[in-house]
């Protein structure tokens, strides 16, 4: 129930909830609140991804591991997880990109993030095009790095495909 509730709430609402309700009595920075709020939000998403990956493994694989006499940990380590990780990697990449985009909400409660700096540059120079193009390129590069990293992990882990 917790995971479904957290995942159904928009990340910006969760950030505001943590900033104005959970951490209202404590003086903490907005960046810290964003890290905690987005960590909670992302953990719900990642748990769903793990659940999807584990559900993809056929029940007969569990029985086969038991028949081989593998303990609970060894069953998951050698039989279940190698098969479950493969469908998880693209989903982790997608969720990581969603998390990257959600970090732009940090500017609503903190003083410094990339989008907030862009706004400050616009106020000083009256030019919005160059800062927005720069921020877009930075986010594009970060997004591509996520995809390239997870692709490398995928290829290294499953080089037999």
Question: What are these model-predicted stretches?
Answer:
Residues 1-161:
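Transmembrane alpha-helices and adjacent helix-loop boundaries
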């Amino acid at each position: 129930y917790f995971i479904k509730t957290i995942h159904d709430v928009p990340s910006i609402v969760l950030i505001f909830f943590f900033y104005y309700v959970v951490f209202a009595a404590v003086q903490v920075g907005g960046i810290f609140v964003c890290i905690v709020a987005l960590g909670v939000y992302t953990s719900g998403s990642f748990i769903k991804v793990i659940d999807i990956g584990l559900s993809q493994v056929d029940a007969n694989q569990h029985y086969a591991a038991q028949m081989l006499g593998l303990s609970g940990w060894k069953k998951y380590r050698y039989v279940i997880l190698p098969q479950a990780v493969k469908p998880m990697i693209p989903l982790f990449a997608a969720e990581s990109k969603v998390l990257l985009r959600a970090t732009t909400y940090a500017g609503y409660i903190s003083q410094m993030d990339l989008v907030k700096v862009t706004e400050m540059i616009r106020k000083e120079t009256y030019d919005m095009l160059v800062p927005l193009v720069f921020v877009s390129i930075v986010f594009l590069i970060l997004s591509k790095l996520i995809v390239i990293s997870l692709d490398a992990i995928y290829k290294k882990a499953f080089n037999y495909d």
